[in-house]
Amino acid sequence: LQPSINGEDWPVFQHDNYRSALTSENLRAEVLEPAWVWQSPQPPQPAWSGPAKWDAYAGLRGLRSMRNYDPVFHVVSASGRVFFGSTVDDSVRCLDALTGETLWIHHTDGPVRISPTFHNNRIYFGSDDGVVRCVDADRGTLIWSFRPKPLERLILNNGRLIPFWPIRTGVLVRGGTAYFAASLLPWKESYLCAVDADTGKATGG
């Protein structure tokens, strides 16, 4: 977008915790022009690429993908910066919204498939390595991390070794609490987690 245009922050996926994908801003689309472009060295690596193989129970074939939630890098924006996770180099990036300059990169041990959350100048996100992280939005330094389940065996998924409980949800922050889930296989337990957004400690509720 043109650097001279100011807009409301878009701090979470689809704007807000209700996923409204709406903003009160009024912009004239016909005057918008690209100001810069950031290009990944490789295309995104979805967790479940291609269509569903088939429905064994109903005997159906030729189904569309049911888990196509990460075909692109979903972007959030706040305080003049752009943030997004990558399934290519297992990271979250922060770019200057006016220039596209990379301000910092925070690497993880697995793909970051869902857009991060900006809250109180912190960035919250999960990764396929089974860890949720909170980093400083200015510098990208780690504030806290939380793993719902101790690391045990790893399994092969999408050409990568990952734990049984990757974090493939966003992190919803509300009332001082960060909510997220860890799950993968239907025959293994799933975890819905609530931790203190400031400290990363489990709330016990």
Label the model's feature ranges.
Residues W10, L63-V92, H106-R133, R160-C193:
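Repeat-blade elements of multi-bladed beta-propeller folds
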